[in-house]
C-alpha cells in the first residue's frame, strides 16, 4: 500500500503514477474520499465517546432527582456510540479496500510506456556467431537426454517436464552456485514454505490484477507461491526489525508455481514458460533511504551470476506500464537466445519501496527509536529458465554443449554429449 501522507500532500503525483502504469487515476480520488470519510467517522466516534465519558462523570455527581433524565440521555448516547463505532469499522474496511486497489507509486526515473517501451541500460557480451544451424534448447535437451517434455505432459499436462540426468544436475548446479554466491555476499540461506496464507499472498501484491496467475487450494484456502519472494516477505510480518547494522538479506530456494493463465499460445515449446520451476530468490528488508542503493547491489549480484554462466545479456529498465503492482522500479537481465534471435528475461530485480512492508506491517526503529515502515526488494539469482540460455549459447556443431566452467564441479563434466 502507498503512504497516505503522500496521497494527501501530493495526489497529483499518485495520479501521474497511475496514468504511467496505464491504470485508472480515478482510484486515487476513490482513496481520497475513503480516507476523508474514515477520518470523519473516527472524529465522530471520538467525540461521542468523549461526550459519553463526560456524561458518566456528570451522572456520578448529579442529585438523585436529576439522575433519571441523565440516565435516559446516557442510554441514547450509548446507542449513538455503538452506531458511530460501527460506521467507523465500515469506513476502515472501505479505506482498506480502496488503499489495496492502488498500485505502488513508480519512481521518477522509470521509463514511460508499456511492455515494449523499456530502456536498454547496458549490453554485455556479443551473441555467438555459429558456422552451423543452431538448434533450440528443446532439440538440444532431448538429444542430450537432459529433459523429457512428452512424459512431463503425460504425467501432469502441458507446460510440465522432467529434467533428467545431466539436465537435473545442471539445474541443481545453477541453484547451488547461486546459494554459494548469496551466502558469500552476506545473505541468509532459506528454504521457505511454498504454500502461504491469503493475507501473505495479498500482502505481497500478487492477488490484484495478476490473481489469475496464482494457484489456489480452495479447500485449505492456501496459495502456491510463484516465487519465494512471497514467503520471505511474510517472514517478518507484524514485526519491528533492527536494521541498525544494515539490511536483512535472505536468499530463498524453492519450487515455484504459475498458472500462466494469460499466456495461451506463447512459448509452448520447451521450458521457457512453464507451470513449475525452481529458483533462488534474493529478498531484502532495508530502510527506505537505502532502497535505491540496495537495488543497484541486487543488480550487481545478478550480474555476477550471469557472468558465471558465460552468456551474452542486456540490462533493461522496465517501463511503468509493465511493472507489477508492488514494484516502484524494476531492472531485468535478458540473455540472448540464438534460436529466437532475441533476448529473453533471466532475472528481474524490483524495488518495492514501502508498499509490501506497509501491507504486511513490517517496521524498523529509526535513530530516535520510533517505528517506521521498512522497504523491501527482491531479485532472481538463478532459475530453471537459465538452462535455455546455457544450452543454446554453448552448443557446438556436433550437437554437444560446453558446460560453463563455474558449473563443471556440480555437473561432473565439461561437455554434455548424447547418452551412449
From Swiss-Prot:
<dbReference type="GO" id="GO:0004828">
    <property type="term" value="F:serine-tRNA ligase activity"/>
</dbReference>
<comment type="function">
    <text>Catalyzes the attachment of serine to tRNA(Ser). Is also able to aminoacylate tRNA(Sec) with serine, to form the misacylated tRNA L-seryl-tRNA(Sec), which will be further converted into selenocysteinyl-tRNA(Sec).</text>
</comment>
<dbReference type="GO" id="GO:0006434">
    <property type="term" value="P:seryl-tRNA aminoacylation"/>
</dbReference>
<protein>
    <recommendedName>
        <fullName>Serine--tRNA ligase</fullName>
        <ecNumber>6.1.1.11</ecNumber>
    </recommendedName>
</protein>
<feature type="binding site">
    <location>
        <position position="380"/>
    </location>
    <ligand>
        <name>L-serine</name>
    </ligand>
</feature>
<keyword id="KW-0030">Aminoacyl-tRNA synthetase</keyword>
<dbReference type="InterPro" id="IPR045864">
    <property type="entry name" value="aa-tRNA-synth_II/BPL/LPL"/>
</dbReference>
<dbReference type="InterPro" id="IPR015866">
    <property type="entry name" value="Ser-tRNA-synth_1_N"/>
</dbReference>
<dbReference type="InterPro" id="IPR042103">
    <property type="entry name" value="SerRS_1_N_sf"/>
</dbReference>
<feature type="binding site">
    <location>
        <begin position="258"/>
        <end position="260"/>
    </location>
    <ligand>
        <name>ATP</name>
    </ligand>
</feature>
<comment type="pathway">
    <text>Aminoacyl-tRNA biosynthesis; selenocysteinyl-tRNA(Sec) biosynthesis; L-seryl-tRNA(Sec) from L-serine and tRNA(Sec): step 1/1.</text>
</comment>
<dbReference type="GO" id="GO:0005524">
    <property type="term" value="F:ATP binding"/>
</dbReference>
<dbReference type="InterPro" id="IPR010978">
    <property type="entry name" value="tRNA-bd_arm"/>
</dbReference>
<dbReference type="InterPro" id="IPR006195">
    <property type="entry name" value="aa-tRNA-synth_II"/>
</dbReference>
<feature type="binding site">
    <location>
        <begin position="345"/>
        <end position="348"/>
    </location>
    <ligand>
        <name>ATP</name>
    </ligand>
</feature>
<keyword id="KW-0547">Nucleotide-binding</keyword>
<keyword id="KW-0648">Protein biosynthesis</keyword>
<dbReference type="GO" id="GO:0005737">
    <property type="term" value="C:cytoplasm"/>
</dbReference>
<feature type="binding site">
    <location>
        <position position="274"/>
    </location>
    <ligand>
        <name>ATP</name>
    </ligand>
</feature>
<keyword id="KW-0963">Cytoplasm</keyword>
<keyword id="KW-0436">Ligase</keyword>
<dbReference type="Pfam" id="PF00587">
    <property type="entry name" value="tRNA-synt_2b"/>
</dbReference>
<keyword id="KW-0067">ATP-binding</keyword>
<comment type="similarity">
    <text>Belongs to the class-II aminoacyl-tRNA synthetase family. Type-1 seryl-tRNA synthetase subfamily.</text>
</comment>
<comment type="subunit">
    <text>Homodimer. The tRNA molecule binds across the dimer.</text>
</comment>
<dbReference type="GO" id="GO:0016260">
    <property type="term" value="P:selenocysteine biosynthetic process"/>
</dbReference>
<dbReference type="InterPro" id="IPR033729">
    <property type="entry name" value="SerRS_core"/>
</dbReference>
<feature type="binding site">
    <location>
        <position position="281"/>
    </location>
    <ligand>
        <name>L-serine</name>
    </ligand>
</feature>
<dbReference type="InterPro" id="IPR002317">
    <property type="entry name" value="Ser-tRNA-ligase_type_1"/>
</dbReference>
<dbReference type="InterPro" id="IPR002314">
    <property type="entry name" value="aa-tRNA-synt_IIb"/>
</dbReference>
<feature type="binding site">
    <location>
        <begin position="227"/>
        <end position="229"/>
    </location>
    <ligand>
        <name>L-serine</name>
    </ligand>
</feature>
<dbReference type="Pfam" id="PF02403">
    <property type="entry name" value="Seryl_tRNA_N"/>
</dbReference>
